[in-house]
């Protein structure tokens, strides 16, 4: 019989183990913090020991004892070994957030094929590799949540981000295909598509000019966004908890855009 009642406990992550890739700072850190506050055990990885150590210390400063691992998300053998180690030391992963990513802002005809491949490797191939590593144990356990950090750039184009947009467009479709292939195993795979978020990656676009004026791109984004501001990593916390919790058990293959309305807005008519 279907349970027709609602309980706020549906949003609880108590007893869950969450792996968030590249979560020493920024969006990944904010999502991890929200998961910990919802009751989950936090596991994260980063590319080197220094970043992992800094991440562990940052988590401790906010009262979270996180488990940190050094691993390159593009190294398939390394990821397989890391997941096995996590299962032995912490437990089977219930929630995976494919957060690690990079961007290269270069006009397409000036971008090397090597740089293009690097973005694709980290932003698209890595979520495939990490998801592939965790899904078998999720199937055995009878449930699992995978959240891919996509982007509004999977829906529109802009100069200098061809590799990033291509990777995030591919990640959107990987999300839908994981949902299609493993939904019957009670695995939900969804994506969060952030708009322009104030992180270290976007800091150069928000720097004040020498005369004290706003960066032209900063002005452009604020004018183009109905919310009239950049997003913050904390704006992704609620959506991330929803997609990791039982409250989203019938949501699968969906990209939840958290963009302040930018995708819905054609822009203001010039006066």
Regions found by a protein language model. Name each.
Residues 2-9, 156, 241, 252-271:
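Short C-terminal tail/terminal secondary-structure segment
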Residues 17, 24-26:
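Conserved glycine-rich cofactor-binding loop
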Residues 107-108, 115-120, 217, 221:
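Substrate-binding pocket helix/loop in short-chain dehydrogenase/reductase
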Residues 128, 143, 229-258, 263:
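C-terminal substrate-recognition "lid" of short-chain dehydrogenase/reductases
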Residues 131, 167, 175:
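Active-site helix of classical SDR
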Residues 136, 180-184, 249:
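Alpha-helical segment proximal to the catalytic Tyr-Lys
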Residues 151:
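Residue(s) in the substrate-gating loop at a strand-loop-helix junction
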């Amino acid at each position: 019989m279907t349970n027709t009642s609602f309980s706020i406990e549906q949003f609880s992550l108590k007893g869950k183990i969450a792996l968030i890739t590249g979560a020493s700072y920024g969006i990944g850190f904010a999502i991890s913090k929200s998961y910990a506050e919802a009751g989950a055990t936090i596991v994260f990885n980063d590319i080197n020991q220094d970043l992992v150590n800094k991440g562990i210390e940052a988590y401790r400063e906010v009262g979270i004892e996180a488990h940190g691992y050094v691993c390159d998300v593009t190294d398939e053998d390394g990821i397989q070994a890391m997941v096995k180690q996590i299962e032995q030391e912490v437990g089977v992963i219930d929630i995976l957030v494919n957060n690690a990513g990079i961007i290269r802002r270069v006009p397409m005809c000036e971008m090397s094929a090597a740089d293009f491949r690097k973005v694709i490797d980290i932003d698209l191939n890595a979520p495939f590799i990490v998801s592939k590593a965790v899904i078998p144990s999720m199937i055995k356990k009878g449930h699992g949540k995978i959240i891919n950090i996509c982007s509004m750039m999977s829906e529109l184009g802009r100069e200098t981000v061809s590799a990033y947009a291509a990777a995030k467009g591919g990640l959107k479709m990987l999300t839908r295909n994981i949902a299609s292939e493993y939904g019957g195993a009670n695995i939900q795979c969804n994506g969060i598509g952030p708009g322009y978020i104030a992180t270290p990656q976007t800091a150069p676009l928000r720097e004040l000019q020498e005369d004290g004026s706003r960066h032209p791109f900063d002005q452009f984004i604020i004018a183009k966004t109905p919310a009239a501001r950049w997003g913050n990593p904390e704006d992704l916390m609620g959506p991330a908890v929803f997609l990791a919790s039982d409250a989203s058990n019938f949501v699968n293959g969906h990209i939840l855009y958290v963009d302040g309305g930018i995708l819905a807005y054609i822009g203001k008519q010039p006066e």
